[in-house]
Amino acid sequence: MDDHIRFDHQTFELHLLDQRLLPAQEADFVCRSVEDVVYALQTMVVRGAPAIGVTAAWGCVLALREAQGPDWAARLEQGMERIAAARPTAVNLRWAVERMRGVWLAAGGEAGDPAPLLTAFAHAAQTMQDEDVAVCKTLGRHGAACIEDGDCVLTHCNAGALATAGYGTALGVIRAAVEAGKKVSVIADETRPFLQGARLTAWELERDGIPVTVACDNACALLMSRGLVQRVVVGADRIAANGDTANKIGTYGVALLARHFHIPFYVAAPLSTIDPATPDGAGIPIEERPELEVTHMGETRLCPENVPVLNFAFDVTPAEYISGIITEKGVLYPPYGLSIWAALNDLSTGRSAGISAGPLRDEDDAPDAEPDWSRERS
């Protein structure tokens, strides 16, 4: 799947596979303006941190295209900020806009010529999209070493090709394990209220021929207690400098259950999802979404009128519950403050920095003696 984010250079239109309609219908949502991109981001036409970032980059191309006249620089800045503020939790959104801003500054900033800048913007956005696919495949190969032949992997939400420019993060790990010849099956929990697991993860894996079963969110404890889950792999929307991880609401509960049942819990995310400016999870903004997502199923209202609704889109899993963070640089292990810093600064890729190209097998080798949860399973 490599055409769910597609920019038409002839018409200057951004085509996004409308994920709200899956799996019943495959149709594109076409963005012709900054406001179209913001709408697509906010209504989850497109979702998933890396995919949001790539969409934002192409949105900046549209912002520049709209910014005509003597005040083009001010209008471009306004459009880019509008995109960057569309959703608060996924750090890739701001990261992508700032990367495009760097292209602008390199071309002379406000003193530059907007005509050649448009070509530079389009090239930068395409480069970002291509890089994300390559990063996901590299990340997947590192993460595949964490999956054993015969494992059943539980995943939450959708961190697959749809959530990235292609291949996926959590699902990229599963895809890479299957490509390496391992027999892997998946339990996709439904992920209320937007049902990304039931609608999107199951759709992706079924198309790939990877065995997948959908389970209710509240069945997780039972599944683990019966030994039906050997690994958990999830994606991330923002990772703090200490390893605390924001992901789809419900992830924290899955992590707590995994710890209780001694099941390894991995986060798979590119380094662009790490926010070194946020020391810990307390500083990660948590998006609240419309009540309608909870109160209605399609056009049918499920809840009584006038009953308040809480619809937090994300929660934060403390780093202490994460067995490893799978990145394109390798698998990061505790202490995450050190291993994240080393990975971001392109320093050691050795175990002394808490980074490994595969899972640590000996507890004595693990930085700060991260437990090997698989050894404690009964």
Swiss-Prot record:
Give GO MF terms, alphabetically: S-methyl-5-thioribose-1-phosphate isomerase activity
Instruction: List, as start-end ranges, the regions of compositional bias called Acidic residues.
Output: 362-371
EC class of the enzyme, as a word:
isomerase
GO terms classed as biological process: L-methionine salvage from methylthioadenosine
Hey, which pathway is this one from? Amino-acid biosynthesis; L-methionine biosynthesis via salvage pathway; L-methionine from S-methyl-5-thio-alpha-D-ribose 1-phosphate: step 1/6
Please indicate if the UniProt record lists Ubl conjugation as a keyword.
no
Location of region: Disordered: 354-378
Binding positions for substrate per the UniProt entry: 47-49, 87, 196, 247-248
Q: Which family does it belong to?
A: Belongs to the eIF-2B alpha/beta/delta subunits family. MtnA subfamily.
| Protein name (Swiss-Prot/TrEMBL) | Methylthioribose-1-phosphate isomerase
Organism encoding this protein: Desulfovibrio desulfuricans (strain ATCC 27774 / DSM 6949 / MB)
